[in-house]
């Protein structure tokens, strides 16, 4: 009798274990077939591990617009009064009176990749440049000041007596797109032609990224051709190995990709074609 009962108990236990294994396998299969489960987990890990430099989820996942409506600081004057140079930000400047000026107004860890592209283009063409660079360990997006409120005294003085000013920005977007803004000009047309010929996706910018506002610093000096380039987050990521836009990876040129150099050459050739003697 005891043996019969024992046999029944063993049979029940085995049955329960088999059903448990089948349920686990089925649930695992469902998860593996559901892209949202995997994406959510990966996205969560990325935000927690990579987001220390921007201090906000927006830039890291490419949903931060270049022209923010609610900047913490309403001018560069206010920003500089309430923050500390060398701790929160720094400026990199070359001002030798060249006729072409390249600008990264939201460089460093605000719109990653714009400083590197700005300096590389300036070095290639021996142009002057201005780069404002956020260097905080976090909360760098707070240091964004929109272009129409960008009253940096040094930059305003540097814009004088130039043939062209090219301002390089980062925009939102999970597709690799460059928006070309600023008043229509020969240089703008040439940049568009060069980029398209190299396979880049060039699009007309939305109004908030158009660079046509009279108060935008690229338009303040009449006679100075102003160009505003807005590079999506996806495009800027592609400029660096493993799509890694953290400071350490961006800092070394051996981490720059072929796509970065193609974009750089397109800009340089455009400037040289329109202004061959600069």
List the model feature ranges, each with a label.
Residues 4-22:
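Sec-dependent N-terminal signal peptides of Gram-positive bacterial secreted proteins and lipoproteins
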Residues 27, 31-278:
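N-terminal catalytic or cofactor-binding beta/alpha core of small enzyme domains
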